[in-house]
Amino acid sequence: MATILGIDPGSRKTGFGVIKTEGKTAVYVTSGIIRLPVDQPIGPRLGVLFSSLNSIIDEFHPDDLAIEQVFLARNPDAALKLGHARGAAMAACVHRGMNVHEYAARQIKLAVVGTGAASKEQVQHMVKILLKLPA
C-alpha cells in the first residue's frame, strides 16, 4: 500500500492531502491547510512551509508527492512566488527521499472528473465521492 501526499502550493496558504492507495482503491487519511505568515517576507514563509511539510512527512510517512505542474500566470510576481512555494514543497519531499510526480491540471481533472475542462467545484465533488467523504 502506497501513501501519497498531494500538495496545492501557494505563497499565502498551501493545501495538502494524504491518501493510501492499493491498486485503484484510494483511502482518505488526512488533509488540511498550511497557513503561512503573510506579514513576513517570502523567505520566512518558505521556511514555515518547508518545516510544516517535514512535520506532515514525519507523521504520515508518504512515499510519493503529487503536485500540479507550473502553469502560466497573468501576474509575473504571483507566478514567481508560486514557483518559490513549489520549490520549497518539492525540496522538503525530495530531502526526505520521496518520489515527486508532477501533473498538468487538465490531466488531474481528466482523471478525477472525466474531462480536462472540469471546474474546481466538479473536482471537489468527485474527490468527495471517490474518497467517501461527507458532502
What are these regions (language model features)?
Residues M1-A135:
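Phosphate- and other anionic-substrate recognition elements at nucleic-acid/protein interfaces
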